[in-house]
């Protein structure tokens, strides 16, 4: 069975390639697109600190939930033949981790505004998507950790760039039918085209 195949030990090069590839080349927001909803739902006039708070919280949640979800899948679901419950188990795990993350992150970084991020974190499908990809490709724990960290950092980068782009076009005279979601989708599409320039980098 595919689930019982041995996973080769990754090298440091594999780790770095997985990190860079997921953050820039196979960006979960622009290329897949997973996690696009919190990107579009983020306040257009959001403060820089709040954008960084959302990016950091998403990165931490993706890393922790993907690693724990992988351990849960390999250690519990596969040995007991419960692979059909993987989506339910991962979804429950992702939701349950949001509250502890929003409890401990403000204590560790009191300067960042983490309040009110629950809906945006709950709507991020990147965690489930990454776990489904990992289970289908038989990825090891270290590779999955690098991919989840890269996916979170990639989301953080796109979120910051998208917020800057929103701030720049907010003062422009945009026709009424294009205001709001239409111009946001066009902006995200242009960013996706720009990120195609990273395709020349090595991929995993």
Per-segment meaning from a language model:
Residues 156-171:
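Transmembrane alpha-helical segments of integral membrane proteins
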Residues 14-30, 80-94, 145-158:
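Structural signature of hydrophobic alpha-helical transmembrane segments
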Residues 47-60, 84-90, 110-122, 177-182:
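Cytoplasmic-side transmembrane-helix entry/capping segments in multi-pass membrane proteins
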Residues 56-67, 116-132, 155, 180-192:
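Small-residue-rich segments of transmembrane alpha-helices in multi-pass membrane proteins
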Residues 167-186:
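Interfacial loop-to-transmembrane junctions
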Residues 71-120:
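Ordered, amphipathic secondary-structure segments that act as subunit-interaction surfaces
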Residues 193-204:
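Juxtamembrane boundary at the C-terminal end of a transmembrane helix
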Residues 33-41, 102-106, 117, 125-140:
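Generic transmembrane alpha-helix signature in multi-pass membrane proteins
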């Amino acid at each position: 069975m595919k689930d019982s195949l041995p996973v080769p030990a990754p090298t440091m090069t594999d780790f770095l390639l997985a990190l860079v590839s997921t953050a820039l080349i196979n960006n979960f927001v622009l290329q897949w697109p997973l996690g696009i909803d919190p990107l579009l739902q983020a306040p257009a006039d959001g403060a820089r600190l709040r954008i960084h708070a959302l990016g950091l919280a998403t990165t931490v949640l993706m890393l922790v939930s993907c690693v724990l979800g992988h351990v849960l899948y390999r250690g519990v679901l596969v040995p007991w033949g419960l692979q059909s419950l993987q989506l339910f188990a991962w979804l429950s795990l992702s939701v349950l981790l949001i509250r502890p993350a929003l409890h401990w992150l403000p204590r560790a970084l009191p300067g960042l505004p983490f309040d009110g991020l629950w809906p945006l974190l709950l709507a991020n499908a990147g965690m489930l998507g990454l776990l489904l990809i990992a289970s289908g490709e038989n990825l090891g724990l270290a590779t999955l950790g690098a991919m989840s960290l890269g996916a979170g950092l990639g989301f953080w980068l796109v979120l910051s760039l998208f917020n800057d782009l929103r701030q720049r076009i907010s003062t422009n005279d945009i026709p009424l039918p294009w205001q709001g979601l239409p111009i946001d989708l066009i902006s995200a599409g242009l960013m996706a085209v720009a990120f195609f320039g990273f395709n020349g980098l090595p991929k995993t």
